[in-house]
Amino acid sequence: MELVFIRHGFSEWNAKNLFTGWRDVNLTERGVEEAKAAGKKLLDKGYEFDIAFTSVLTRAIKTCNIVLEESHQLWIPQVKNWRLNERHYGALQGLDKKATAEQYGDEQVHIWRRSYDISPPDLDPQDPNSAHNDRRYANIPSDVVPNAENLKLTLERALPFWEDQIAPAMLSGKRVLVVAHGNSLRALAKHIIGISDAEIMDFEIPTGQPLVLKLDDKLNYVEHYYL
């Protein structure tokens, strides 16, 4: 069976080189075109889906809608869940990546961005931009809402959604599309493929490119490739 991952199209803060994380930003025109191209590619290759999973962030939701519209499948059920959100970049969210490197040093910022288990500084829960003050997360216990994450923590909060929602859907015979974010998809790919802690640091998923993961009937990994 096949599982298709798509990272959201190029966003406004991708263009501005800002740390985004859980901040809710829109797609650029380039991002819209990437999503359209992904949908057309899926249509041309004959990919049909029974259900789509995405995050609760606008850039992923819009990408999902565009992909499904272009592939003539906008009618299928979509499940939105915060566990597919991007990695939370803590107090770095909204900061310019280059300026942050100049302030803290390239090595420190590289550790924050690429270390598997070291998180950036926490975002104050009282900050106006904190998820604690966003009503889309109102039903999540406050001690579960992250203030900063590394990739390890991103996997730990995404994995229950894989086990409770995505995997059962696939095992029941449903054809699944997941439209999410660079780090939430990397985390799930790490689990599915069996990528080591060291190797995952160099595993990148470009925006708007359908990534196909071939699995056997027990969801064991076989191979992966881009369309």
Curated annotation (Swiss-Prot):
Binding site for substrate: 7-14, 20-21, 59, 86-89, 97, 113-114, 182-183
The entry's keywords: Gluconeogenesis, Glycolysis, Isomerase
Residues forming the catalytic site: H8, E86
Reactions accelerated catalytically: (2R)-2-phosphoglycerate = (2R)-3-phosphoglycerate
Pathway: Carbohydrate degradation; glycolysis; pyruvate from D-glyceraldehyde 3-phosphate: step 3/5
Domain of life: Bacteria
Pfam family, one: His_Phos_1
InterPro entries, per database record: His_Pase_superF_clade-1, His_PPase_superfam, Phosphogly_mut1
Feature type site, description Transition state stabilizer: H181
Top enzyme class: isomerase
GO biological process: gluconeogenesis; glycolytic process
One example GO MF annotation: phosphoglycerate mutase activity
Keyword field contains tRNA-binding: no
Disulfide bond is among the record's keywords: no
Known EC number: 5.4.2.11
Assigned protein family: Belongs to the phosphoglycerate mutase family. BPG-dependent PGAM subfamily.
Protein function: Catalyzes the interconversion of 2-phosphoglycerate and 3-phosphoglycerate.
HAMAP family with a match to the protein in the record: PGAM_GpmA (MF_01039)
Quaternary structure and partners: Homodimer.
Name of the protein in its database record: 2,3-bisphosphoglycerate-dependent phosphoglycerate mutase
Species whose genome carries this gene: Haemophilus influenzae (strain PittEE)
Gene transcribed to yield this protein: gpmA
